Amino acid sequence: SGVGGISIVLEMRARMPALDILYLSDARFLPYGDRDEAFVLVRSLAAADFLVARGARALVVACNTATAAAVPALRARFDVPVIGVEPAVKPAALATRSGIVGILATASTLQSRRYADLLERFGGFARVIGQPCPGLVEQVEAGDFDGPDTRALLERHLAPLLAAGADTLVLGCTHYPFLRPLIEQLSGPEVCVVDPSGAVARRVQ
């Protein structure tokens, strides 16, 4: 909904430097994680209309909340590939050594049917704990990746996951890769941080 999708653009650019990319940021209405599903669906359809009208040959929904709310409708409406992004539950569940995975995401993503489906399919491999992270998107949008306020927010959001024994953390919002160095610092070297951005870029290839 804002600059979060740039984390995926950077991965795409690294793999496909000649690719023409149209990037649309709905900065007026961010964060989508605080919006209801119907609102996000309407905004996503409008954004896709804008991009397809300007020649987009594929749509990357570079937002977990918008993916959960809009990808089926987008695929039904447009004759171009639609690629979404969602929490990397499967690779995290297979990678964990402690058997406990933490998902850092917005409340909307954690409450979505799409996330529930992921848990049904892959949650049997590990105990998966969803942690809503209010405030983090706003910190990233403000360019505050490691200031005291961001650090305090992350410490609060990470504490229950680390206390539960999570050794694998999933970045379940496209804004959060910008906070990865701080997340890794606060979590310690024994905790693996999983970022799905690379997997999305590979699907575009």
List the predicted regions and their residue ranges.
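Non-catalytic structural scaffold of enzyme domains
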Residues: 1-205
